[in-house]
């Protein structure tokens, strides 16, 4: 039994609606919030910036205005505001628009598709601004890795019937564009979580840290910056290594690199191996193999640090596990399941660390 509320028909309809999720993703992909960041635009002007059809974009915007992500004014409101001299939303000092050309809140859905009224960025739409703190735009971009994940769910029926998708979507199989988008998303997360990881345990006890599957090196940059005496090596696919070397140079840190497929490489010896959001990408046999390769390369008294999300929030845990299913590889695991996988690789858990941001850290030793 559970004390969670039982969804009614209206709740189910809202939960199953695909219009809002797709409309938001199209807005993110077309960068509509960024195009409106400097002030209101007509549908024609916005369409020109977004490389979209003005009439179709106007209809999309009318929906997003009704949902509160953007603001609008009709042609009639434009004339009324121009006559009265009263500014609308976004028309104050520094807004970069002429008097009388602002956007009124009273006409949220007042723009006819293809009309000459203006659209402006609403408060809710600011989460779609690229680069803004907490921005979701890159995750929602249908042309990036976020879109790759989203589209995979349209194959959920076949996946559930067959036990897995027709084609796996791990990083090795991604297109260069999708793989680059994935690296960028993971780097943003690593930069945000890196300081907390550097503080949660004493990295000065290590001489050499190897980050296995560390993307473009954002996590290693955080560690090597906080602990200058630490030596680091990044193990990644060759395309990611190229970007990582540029990032290391820009950050002014010295870091070794080893490019190739983890399962085909001989890992360098080190006293700490870091696997961040990596094992959940593997089924159990591959996870055991990855951990065993790290164990064999450990210096005496070394450890393997597994960074994976906690299963403390069931809804989030279940969502991520379903995502791994439709992507065709890996699974989320409970603490006990990670311990079992580690044991099969000849490792046992020594400690758990809980950073103030990011995944928990599981320390495994021989």
Region locations from a protein language model:
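Conserved Class I S-adenosyl-L-methionine-dependent methyltransferase catalytic core
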Residues: 14-27, 34-35, 49, 55-80, ...
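Alpha-helical subdomain
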Residues: 1-81, 203, 208, 212-366
